[in-house]
Amino acid sequence: SDALFENLHALNDLAHELDKTRLTTMANLSMVENDSPLNHITDVISYNHYFGWYLGKVEDNAPWLDTFHAENPEICLGISEYGCEGIPTLHSASPKVRDYSEEYQAYYHEKMLETFAQRPYLWSTHVWNMFDFASDMRDEGGVQGRNNKGLVTFDRQTRKDSFYIYKAYWTKAPFVHICSRRFKERAEETVQVKVYSNCEQVSLKVNGKKIDSVAGKYVFTFDRVPLTMGENIIQAAGFLGQQEVCCESIPLVRVAEPNASYVLQEEAEKAGQNAKNWFATGDEAGEPLQFPEGYFSIRDKVGALLKNPEGEKLVSELVDQMMPGMKISKGMLNMAKHFTIEKVIEMAGDRIPPEMVRYLNQRLNQIQK
């Protein structure tokens, strides 16, 4: 709305008036268009992006950044939020989005750091978050009241594997870190062993027998590492030139059957899909939200709703009620059409309270597909 833009311009002017030496910035949500006037108010700009968690794939971050930079070479671009959840008790040999495994979180941050390192035009990147933190309305990954996007657990006692990919990029002291150490029980004859390190080369041994040496940078992967039944000692050593400069060992136990506790059963069928919007699952004070077959709900995409005449009318009505005077451009609708309505609600945060979510879902339930 005009009032929003006037307010942002006023805040930007006030910041410069208070301190002319400091640059101003602003954090945009993903759905703010590349050519939005919002990107031309402050000195520099940042975006909150969760490709690879709430929507899309982690690999989608790179083309988005390059497209924005190509279209706006004069804008100094940063990432003000990015991250995904990882719970140290959950594990997978084939990690996927929404399995909440420590392995998927580590993979996500591997790809993000790789993306950032290849794009020196970024003025900043801000990982969300260093530590797991309290969030009383959340219920994700089998954990109530907590956001699990931290690189370190809530009690500050456990550094997740994702912590060590940052250490590999940033520290100068030589180290090796064998990943998936809490994924201790394995039912497979062979496993993949991944090591994070800032060394030039990493050598791997199992029960004292050398498996291989790999030269690389930050991420060292050893495939088809054999395990015998019972305990196996996995040892990784880091080298600078020909000299071994660090090493560590962890136990892995070969078992007959997979450990079911490593998998979040209620989310197992949804693994590989984007994370749900915790805000839009219904509040405890009322009946659960309904998702009748053949009718719309907040789980449907905006684009599908706009193709339905009744749905398009409802969208127009809601925009008028919730954002009076705000003009929604075709470009914004085109971008939003790929999101579920749940995702749009999540982006809006506390501007859309639970009772409004319930009302919206009830209205959608009356529209036949």
Predicted feature locations:
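Compact, charge-rich alpha-helical regulatory domains located at protein termini
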Residues: G286-M356
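Short strand-edge motifs at loop-to-beta-strand transitions and within beta-strands
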Residues: Y218-D223
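Repeat-associated, polar segments at repeat-unit boundaries in modular proteins
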Residues: R351-K369
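Edge beta-strands of extracellular beta-sandwich domains
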Residues: Q242-A256, L264
